[in-house]
Design a protein with these regions (language model features):
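Bacterial N-terminal signal peptides that target proteins for export
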Residues: 1-8
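C-terminal motif of bacterial Sec signal peptides marking the signal peptidase cleavage site
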Residues: 14-17
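Bacterial signal peptide processing site
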Residues: 19-21
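Primary mode marks residue(s) on the alpha4-beta5-alpha5 output face of response regulator receiver
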Residues: 25-56, 65-183
Length: 183
């Protein structure tokens, strides 16, 4: 019995030593392979930050441009927290103008290059080209931002008509914002 227990204990120690030397698999970097070509970031750029934006989008009821007597819900601006994959807030996204700001105070705006359908009930996927960052920090050198994995955020279903011009509606949304810098 003592021999069996000693052998079992030795096996546990040996296996524990092996296990402690094994490292956890490296976290997967975001892959854009499954995204529509229109919103893929050009070669020569690499992912430097992956965030999950959780927040709200405000829409305002306005008269349609060049369509007398017609009205529509118009995107008025986002307000979201940017969280890292572990759930820690690393920044915020707000506007207008659309602004991504790191907790270190650096921030940037961007110019939309393309959109692609995000699925029924979801705002579109988006690719933007970053303008030069303001302030030193994480946003310095960012070249592109992708909005992917969108959930919600579409204009409200309630009617927008002459009687409620100027009314605002807030809808919840979530999206991943992937930040790139030149390789």
């Amino acid at each position: 019995m003592k021999t069996t227990l000693a052998a079992a204990a030795a096996a546990v120690v040996a296996l524990s030593a092996c296990a402690s030397k094994m490292s956890a698999p490296a976290p997967m970097m975001f892959s854009q392979a499954s995204l529509p070509a229109a919103v893929q970031v050009p070669a020569g750029n690499k992912v430097v930050l992956e965030t999950v934006g959780v927040g709200q989008i405000t829409y305002e009821c306005r008269a349609k441009a060049n369509a007398t007597g017609e009205f529509e819900w118009v995107f008025a601006g986002p307000d979201a927290k940017l969280m890292d994959r572990a759930g820690k807030q690393v920044g915020k996204y707000y506007g207008p103008p659309a602004t991504w700001e790191s907790m270190d105070g650096s921030k940037l705006t961007a110019t939309q290059l393309a959109v692609a359908p995000g699925g029924t009930g979801n705002i579109p996927l988006q690719l933007v080209k970053a303008n030069p960052a303001m302030g030193a920090g994480a946003m310095q050198g960012v070249t592109f931002i992708q909005r992917v994995a969108t959930k919600g955020g579409v204009a409200p279903a309630m009617p927008c008509a002459a009687g409620n011009v100027g009314a605002k509606q807030i809808v919840n949304y979530q999206a991943d914002y992937i930040f790139y810098k030149a390789s």
